[in-house]
Amino acid sequence: MGLVSGSVQFIRKDPDFTEKPYNINATLTAGSNDRLDGSLEAEFGGKYGYVRTNISHNEADDYKDGDGNRIHSNFKRDSQMLQLGVTPTENTTIAGTYERSRAKVAYADRMMDGSKFDRDAWNIRFTQRNLTPWFSELELRYGKSEIDHVMDTYSLRTIYNPAGKQIKNANNPKRNTDTGRLKATFDWDKLNLQTGLDYLDDVHVARNERGGDGYSHKPYMPNQSFKQWGIFTEASWQQTDNQRWVAGLRHDQVKAHYDTARVTDPVLKHQKFNLNSGFLRWERNTDNGLKYYAGFGIAERAPNYWERLRSENKAIRAEQNRQIDAGVIWKRPNLHASVSVFGSNIKDFIMMERQGMNFGVRNINASRFGGEAEVKWTFAPNWEVGTSLAYTHGKNRTDGKPLAQTPPLEWNNTLAFDNGKFSAGALWRVVAKQNRYSKGQGNIVGQDIGASSGFGVLSLNAGWKFSKYATLQGGVDNVFNKTYAEFVSRGGDPSAGTQTMRVNEPGRTAWLRLQAKF
């Protein structure tokens, strides 16, 4: 569910050419199972503009689990990004970005593989900073993207029916999205205010083939479409040097439409969701290195494409999550410790479940609570030891059962050495067995299959910074070649079909990485 009393945004910053007119970062990784990863990030520019590019390649063959069984898991992905920016003044940026990726992936836990994952996207951004002493920034973004997926039973595998004939089925969903965003930032003495609105126009079409491979000659058929408008505001008030309050509100209107002729009920065919979300967060720092925080939030979301696809003739209500969280962080020169806890009540949780040979969707009431504790100690120069513990408990209150796809107790232990030139590390990951499951229930990514066994996995790594610009790293994951599987499914694109089995993770794998920065 995530924390609703706060959020983190990952934003690609404008490049900084204060020290030099370029920045280059190149990485090459090779490993077991014919793994090969490579990436190049480069940016060049000056006072009035810049160009930035990112090129990456990732591929691997099927891996073997700890028992030596080959797991159908090969993949290949290539992606490129090009961004051009113009900075006519020190406070103005106009940037255009194009991103492209092509991929294919084999799924061991499903009856179909992703033989085509094509994505093309572009966006343009205008930013004006320091308009007035209190009007800090105005930002406008617009973007378009197209995603074209193909899932089939024959490109990356060969399967036969009882009569000995090859099974050839394919699904080809396609998605076109337009997005826009306007945001203004204001700063006063102790108050920061961000407010704006955003827009999403999302259109889905699809085509399929049963008993052949001729889907590409068929026309796309309308499937679903969504239109969403949102307005938001977030304020941060530095009440004192040691105390801060953060609050936010958001309202969204989502219009969801079935374009397929299979849905004839006008109440279901055209649905409108008015969604309200908000949070309040308190933070306090003390002079002895302690930081306290607590928050409360409410988040609502409408059913997404995949959930609506499984419930074409049934009204699904929006999901509402009410959550509280609190924690404490303690920082000393050689010690870092933190404890956090949360509790949430989810009304109309959108759950997928197996119904005979098919899957259905319904709303339930659910609850979750859990916490995490972590300690890191620098016990000697260049040496650090750490440990962390995390647990989540989920309950389906409607059925009186465990909430599906809830991970078990996990305990991580680390030991690291780094003197600036040489480094080494060890990670011992211990995961408890999970007996709290609800077979056949879950979400769009995966469903509970049954209980899972506990496991412990040790991984080692080392590094050598042999020059000012380059570092060589290597490691071995799952050193003792343990056979194990995660409880929560991680493999699922929902369009690849129904999860049918739990898949073992890789056995012992080795890797070597060369990284250079200029």
Show which residues each predicted segment covers.
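Periplasmic-side early beta-strands and strand-to-turn transitions of outer-membrane beta-barrels
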Residues: 8-11, 15-19, 25, 36, ...
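Transmembrane beta-strands of outer-membrane beta-barrel pores
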Residues: 28-32, 46-48, 57-61, 100-104, ...
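Membrane-embedded beta-barrel scaffold of Gram-negative outer-membrane proteins
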Residues: 49, 53, 136-155, 283-297, ...
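Flexible loop and strand-edge segments within Gram-negative outer membrane beta-barrel domains
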Residues: 60-61, 77, 91-138, 145-177, ...
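Signature of Gram-negative outer-membrane beta-barrel scaffolds
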Residues: 67, 71, 193-290, 302-303, ...
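Outer-membrane beta-barrel "beta-signal"
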Residues: 124-126, 281, 327-329, 334-336, ...
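Gram-negative outer-membrane beta-barrel transporters
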Residues: 238-246, 252-254, 341-345, 362-440, ...
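C-terminal beta-signal and adjacent terminal beta-strands/loops
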Residues: 345-347, 380, 430-439, 463-518
